[in-house]
Amino acid sequence: MYIGRFLVVGKTQQGKPFVSYRVSSRSFPNRKAVINNTNDTVAILPNDLNDMFANPYIAYNCIKIVGNTVIATNGTHTDIIADKIKLELPIRDALALSLIAMDYEKDDYNTPRIAVVLNENTAYMGYVADNDIRIKEVPLKDGLAYYLSTYECCRISTEHQNIVVDGENPEEICKFVMDYEKFEKPVCCATATIDGDIELGTL
């Protein structure tokens, strides 16, 4: 099944909070996830930078760390949400203001913007589509995670969209998410785990 770009948020079997973001793409598969020099941001970049002239939505920061909080999204709203978190807005408010302001992507598919904000004790998922907007706190339970995608599964459901993720560090979780055969067209992945410190990994 093709569900496009998606986020996975939850806890590992050993109780570490994590969030993963996977790019799945039919149109622009030649992309990579790159961690910046200060180890607090992951960017999605095309292998050929000229591709950015063909589509403005294919390059963006997908993960950003602000203090003890991780912001993960499928677009440039990562930075907008992160700025609100820096200003110490509550997570719900930071998500709501940012998603309303940015709105869905104005591409051929009206692609929804999806987002997760995570810290050691709290996880929120949110999205804005052309006909819907929602923000919801989701429970963090050891060994359980939830996914939210741009297509087919753009809804927040802890009952029907849950997944047991294998892995304890960012690289292992990235590999699991990339290899997850139920969802087609994997391109690249980025993961943040919280275990005292926040660690980043890509694949």
From Swiss-Prot:
Judging by the UniProt lineage, the source's domain of life is: Archaea
Q: What is its EC number?
A: 3.5.4.10
GO process annotations (BP): 'de novo' IMP biosynthetic process
Which keywords does this chain's UniProt record carry? Hydrolase, Purine biosynthesis
- Asked if the record carries the keyword Cell membrane, the reply is no
What Gene3D superfamilies would the database entry show?
Inosine monophosphate cyclohydrolase-like (3.60.20.20)
This protein's pathway reads: Purine metabolism; IMP biosynthesis via de novo pathway; IMP from 5-formamido-1-(5-phospho-D-ribosyl)imidazole-4-carboxamide: step 1/1
Q: Which catalytic reaction applies to this protein?
A: IMP + H2O = 5-formamido-1-(5-phospho-D-ribosyl)imidazole-4-carboxamide
> Does this entry carry the keyword Hydrolase?
yes
Pfam families (UniProt xref): IMP_cyclohyd (PF07826)
Q: Which HAMAP family match?
A: IMP_cyclohydrol
Q: Which family does it belong to?
A: Belongs to the archaeal IMP cyclohydrolase family.
> What NCBIfam families would the database entry show?
PRK04151.1, purO_arch
What is the documented function of this protein? Catalyzes the cyclization of 5-formylamidoimidazole-4-carboxamide ribonucleotide to IMP.
UniProt protein name: IMP cyclohydrolase
Organism of provenance: Methanococcus aeolicus (strain ATCC BAA-1280 / DSM 17508 / OCM 812 / Nankai-3)
Name the gene behind this protein. Answer: purO
